[in-house]
Amino acid sequence: MLAIGVVLGAGWALLRAHRRVVGQDRAWRVQEEAKARELSMAEVDELSWQEFELYIADLCRRDGCTEVVVSGKSGDLGADAIGYLADGRKLVIQCKKYAPHRSVSSQDMQKFVGTARLEHGADVALFVTTSRAFTKAALGLALRQDIVALHRDLLGSWVRGAHLETLIPLNGSGGGAKRRPFA
């Protein structure tokens, strides 16, 4: 009887150890997959606009968004991707893959403002770009209309692992001090 108890106890301990190791392995694999999806901003710049939209959707999924769908076409009425944040709020995303030196214009922002909530029912409207800045008029409009404006610097933070929900309150800030152009 004692021998059976010892064998069962050892078996139970081995089973628990096995489950713990399998769980640790699973967590490690998830982390490695996330690292493999992280790109440098130079690599992001090399993406086509379609690949950029898919990559933004992947970042959303990484951060717990669900039901993320990419339209993948023009004529999407300003919604390049739609999904739901972890807390259930509907997220509508406009992606603009512009050259880093370009600014997002007020006209681009106006189009998104006009459709994000009225057409798509966004609870959170996110405008993400590879350019360094939004024009003053575009950023002002975004702030007045509660559009999250994610420029290149904030996108870089997101790419490097910052969680989307930590970036939302920054809304266009974090661009650094304005510098005079080199003479």
Give residue ranges: language-model regions.
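Mixed-charge (Asp/Glu-Lys/Arg
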Residues: 1-77, 82-183
